[in-house]
């Protein structure tokens, strides 16, 4: 029998819980013990190192700090970190007035506050065409010997070295260029490393300096060992070794789990700690960058980020150390963020960072709900227990007396957000035997225990089921254990949680860059996990190591490619469809076709990326052009950043629209605009490319010249794209198109995003 708490308004009550849920989580976020310290940590960035000797660099930092604090004792007590390997800077505990005074020192380029950042599989590689068997057919994976010789640096929450994903059976010697080490600390020693895990360090001073109560060994491992689990999953996704017969209580039983570059080496830099689900101090993350650059990593996977930016990211977070890594040939891969489908929520927007959006896989863990008339509804669940025979259902939105109504029943609960006031634990505690969540499509992360029937229905299906049940005086449902559905019938989508472009502070730079699978990835579980729910991870932080693994393969295949060339190869060969040819859509209530602000160039196509034909390259001059365009950098600051007195900001006539990124985005088109790009031929020496234009709706797009002819002496050519508003005479939303250069073998495609802005400060 269907029951309700309020017979005349139960459906409204189901939705009423939404407001309470948001207020509760916003007001209850911070826990005791994480109160900021009275002397905040500030980061002072000084640019490129002026000395090769790190000791001399550190001494110069102490002298700068002493110029404000006066005594050597106060200086040593204040210093948290000296960044002296990959770049020059330091972190120090100071009073705000002292920090402001030090900001005026002539060697200080930028002063940053020490923000707190958050931590943002089996089927993944089959889905992308890299089949998960050690003996499968020829591919990029095998041409690169599965990434052997590459070192992937991971800045995250640590690593559980005993996992089978980090077994070194069959590995060759550690690369000669490696200069890192495995430190000895709390329940971790150099013996925990091997030829797979070749480096492991940790950084906590920045976070502890900002907390009233320091993190201690009762709640965390004060070592590279992973207590949170996130770092272990990220590492295994990027470069995990082959693990046969991987299973999660029957889920994907018999699968082979591996990372993107299964024979690549891993170096873990633990800078994130198990506080409030995962907290990373910017000061600690910078130190991890500093040492990773020095140690000799080939790729950096950094699955961290803050909330949507209220300022340029070159003033906060990871952009500056990432620039130094990229300038030294190390690609930096980071997430777009998990703040959902709202516009301008993307993070890590600097053009030198490879920013990753998340998509779903062609896999669904599905459970059947059967009515007494045999009508069925399909929901998502990881429930592996026995079938629940026909039983009563109750719909509730106000669970104040849930203890009186749930016993022996299945609860149907409507929710429109990721935070739910009614949890499986509460239902179980009060005798309920199942829970059906009805919520908007896209909240696909599976967060329920596998031993309790906890099923997700989207709002449309849930409303249909609710309406159907309400018309019956007596209705029961049956719940079946999950079944895995794989293949073309499961549509691939951009995850609802994946943050969207454009960046509100640099809208002319398209972000995110690329998309990769990031939802419901099956990864290793560390023994400290309380249950099996953490085995299944989702988010852009899981999509990030997918791309990092692919980048490692490309570095082995093309050792001379710059980070910008690698990004270009990924973006220009990406797919606008899933591997089955269906257009990618957006996971969420609007069901729209995905566009460049959802996925950048599209879904990664790693086999095409190894032979892109043409590439859009960039170097430090392009990146300083970007910095200068934001009016943050003077000639003096640019010279300090690059370590070259001859490097200066470009002339005032140079437009940010001409930055050689593999995209064209014009956020404020008022008339005709010319945009230039330069492409480098990395394909057949003698080749001819012709343009194919898909103009955004209502805009005119013309390309000149009409052909690009490459030969031995001409492997780099420029072209101009002329854009005009066409039929548009009002402020528009963004419209999307593309430009493809084709030689009938390669199709080198960049996205075009255009918006008119005839009236300033006018909101549509």
From Swiss-Prot:
Q: What class of enzyme is it?
A: hydrolase
Q: An example Gene Ontology cellular component term from the record?
A: extracellular space
**According to the UniProt entry, where is the signal peptide?**
1-32
Q: Which domain of life is it from?
A: Eukaryota
CDD domains found in the cross-reference section: PA_subtilisin_like, Peptidases_S8_3
Propeptide boundaries: 33-120
Q: What is this protein called?
A: Subtilisin-like protease SBT3.1
């Amino acid at each position: 029998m269907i029951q309700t708490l309020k017979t005349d308004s139960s459906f409204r009550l189901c939705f009423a819980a939404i407001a309470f849920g948001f207020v509760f989580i916003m007001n209850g976020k911070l826990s005791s013990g994480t109160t900021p310290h009275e002397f905040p940590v500030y980061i002072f960035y000084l640019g490129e190192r002026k000395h090769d000797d790190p000791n001399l660099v550190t001494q110069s930092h102490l002298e700068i700090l002493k110029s404000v604090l006066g005594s050597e004792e106060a200086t040593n007590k204040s210093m948290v970190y000296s960044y002296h390997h990959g770049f020059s800077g330091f972190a120090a505990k100071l009073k705000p007035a002292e920090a402001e005074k030090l900001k005026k020192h002539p060697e200080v380029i930028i002063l940053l506050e020490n923000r707190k950042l958050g931590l943002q599989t089996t089927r993944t590689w089959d889905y992308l065409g890299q089949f998960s068997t050690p003996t499968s057919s020829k591919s990029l994976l095998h041409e690169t010997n599965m990434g052997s010789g590459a070192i992937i640096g991971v800045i995250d929450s640590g690593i559980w070295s005993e996992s089978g994903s980090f077994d070194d059976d069959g590995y060759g010697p550690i690369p000669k260029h490696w200069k890192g080490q495995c430190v000895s600390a709390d329940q971790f020693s150099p013996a925990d490393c091997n030829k797979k895990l070749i480096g492991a360090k940790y950084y906590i001073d920045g976070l502890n300096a900002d907390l009233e109560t320091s993190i201690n060994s009762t709640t965390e491992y004060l070592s590279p060992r992973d207590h949170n689990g996130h770092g272990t999953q990220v590492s295994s996704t990027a470069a995990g070794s082959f693990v046969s017969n991987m299973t999660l209580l029957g889920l994907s039983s018999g699968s082979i789990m591996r990372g993107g570059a299964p024979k690549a080496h891993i170096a873990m830099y633990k800078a994130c700690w198990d506080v409030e689900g995962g907290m990373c101090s910017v000061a600690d993350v910078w130190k991890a960058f500093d040492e990773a650059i020095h140690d000799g990593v080939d790729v950096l996977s950094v699955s961290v980020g803050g909330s949507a930016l209220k300022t340029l990211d070159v003033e906060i977070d990871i952009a500056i150390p990432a620039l130094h890594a990229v300038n030294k040939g190390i690609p930096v891969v980071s997430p777009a963020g998990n703040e959902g489908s709202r516009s301008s929520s993307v993070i890590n927007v600097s053009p030198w960072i490879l920013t990753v959006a998340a998509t779903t896989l062609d896999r669904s863990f599905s459970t059947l709900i059967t009515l007494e008339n045999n009508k069925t509804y399909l929901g998502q669940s990881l429930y592996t227990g026995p079938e629940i025979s026909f039983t009563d259902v109750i719909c509730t939105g106000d669970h104040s007396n849930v203890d009186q109504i749930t016993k022996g029943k299945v609860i149907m609960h409507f929710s429109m957000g990721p935070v739910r006031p009614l949890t499986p634990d509460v239902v179980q505690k009060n005798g309920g035997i199942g829970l059906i969540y009805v919520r908007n499509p896209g909240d696909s992360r599976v967060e329920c225990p596998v031993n309790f029937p906890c099923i997700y229905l989207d709002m449309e299906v849930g409303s249909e089921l609710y309406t159907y049940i309400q018309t019956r005086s007596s209705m029961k449902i049956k719940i079946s254990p999950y079944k895995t559905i794989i293949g073309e019938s499961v549509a691939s989508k951009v995850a609802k949680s994946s943050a969207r472009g454009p960046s509100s502070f640099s809208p002319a730079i398209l972000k995110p860059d690329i998309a990769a699978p990031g939802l419901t990835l099956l990864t290793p579980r560390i023994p400290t996990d309380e249950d099996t729910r953490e085995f299944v991870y989702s988010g852009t932080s899981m999509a990030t190591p997918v791309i990092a693994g692919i980048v490692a393969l490309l570095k082995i295949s093309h050792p001379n490619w710059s980070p910008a060339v690698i990004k270009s190869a990924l973006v220009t060969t990406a797919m606008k469809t899933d591997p089955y040819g269906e257009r990618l859509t957006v996971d969420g209530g609007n069901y729209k076709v995905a566009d460049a602000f959802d996925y950048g160039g599209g879904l990664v196509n790693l086999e095409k990326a190894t032979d892109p034909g043409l590439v859009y390259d960039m170097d430090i001059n392009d990146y300083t052009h970007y910095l200068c365009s934001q009016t943050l950098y003077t000639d003096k600051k640019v010279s300090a950043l690059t370590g070259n007195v001859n490097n200066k900001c470009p002339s005032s006539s140079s437009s940010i629209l001409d930055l050689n990124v593999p995209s064209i985005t014009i956020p404020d088109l008022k008339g005709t605009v010319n945009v230039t790009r330069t492409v480098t031929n990395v394909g057949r020496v003698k080749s001819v490319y012709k343009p194919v234009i898909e103009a955004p709706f209502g805009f005119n797009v013309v390309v000149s010249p009409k052909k690009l002819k490459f030969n031995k002496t001409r492997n780099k050519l420029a072209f101009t794209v002329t854009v005009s508003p066409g039929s548009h005479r009002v402020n528009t939303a963004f419209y999307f198109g593309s430009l493809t250069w084709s030689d009938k073998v390669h199709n080198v495609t960049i996205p075009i995003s255009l918006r008119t802005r005839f009236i300033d400060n006018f909101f549509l």
